[in-house]
């Protein structure tokens, strides 16, 4: 039987975010560990304190196969960006203003590939630092779960582009301001 003062650590990420931690975990030392955890501090995804503390309390088992698969995803993203930089000169075209005189279709393609370049430029560091956290046994939320061209709406784009920050804002700003009950304050 579990002690009423010590809640069980949930395995589900949504539960780990929502469930409060024991009062003694909301200390200055725990806050510093959370704030200065290197994989997430440098350039990793944003993680809620409750999720982080729950995983420190009861470390998750992350199968080596899942970590290896994620490592392959990081490598594929890196090589895809290298391929794009080597064969598609959209960044050079933009910087040198070589797009002057292009047809509207060509301008559209240059713009689209510039967006894809920005996506790669951001997804690679986020995935590398999340991989570092996974190797350390911390399952941080995945950012950019969709490609930029696979967002059906602005809301879908926001929820998937910087997903971990969206979850943090919902947990620490939107819900305390009243959530859907008080949309004027939550704007």
Report residues per predicted region:
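Membrane-embedded transmembrane alpha-helical bundles that form the catalytic cores
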Residues: 1-187
């Amino acid at each position: 039987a579990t002690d009423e003062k010590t809640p069980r650590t949930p395995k589900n990420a949504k539960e780990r975010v929502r469930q409060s931690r024991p009062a003694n975990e909301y200390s200055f030392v725990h806050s510093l560990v959370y704030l200065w955890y290197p994989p997430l501090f440098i350039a990793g995804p944003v993680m809620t304190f409750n999720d982080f503390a729950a995983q420190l309390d009861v470390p998750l088992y992350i199968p080596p196969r899942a970590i290896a698969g994620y490592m392959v995803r990081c490598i594929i993203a890196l090589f895809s960006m290298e391929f794009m930089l080597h064969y598609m000169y959209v960044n050079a075209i933009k910087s040198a203003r070589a797009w002057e005189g292009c047809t509207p279709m060509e301008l559209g393609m240059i713009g689209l590939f510039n967006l894809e370049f920005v996506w790669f430029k951001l997804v690679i560091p986020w995935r590398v630092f999340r991989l570092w956290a996974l190797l350390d046994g911390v399952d941080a939320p995945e950012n950019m779960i969709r490609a930029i061209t696979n967002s059906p709406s602005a809301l879908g784009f926001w929820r998937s582009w910087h997903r971990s920050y969206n979850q943090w804002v919902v947990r620490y700003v939107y819900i305390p301001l009243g959530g859907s009950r008080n949309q004027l304050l939550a704007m």
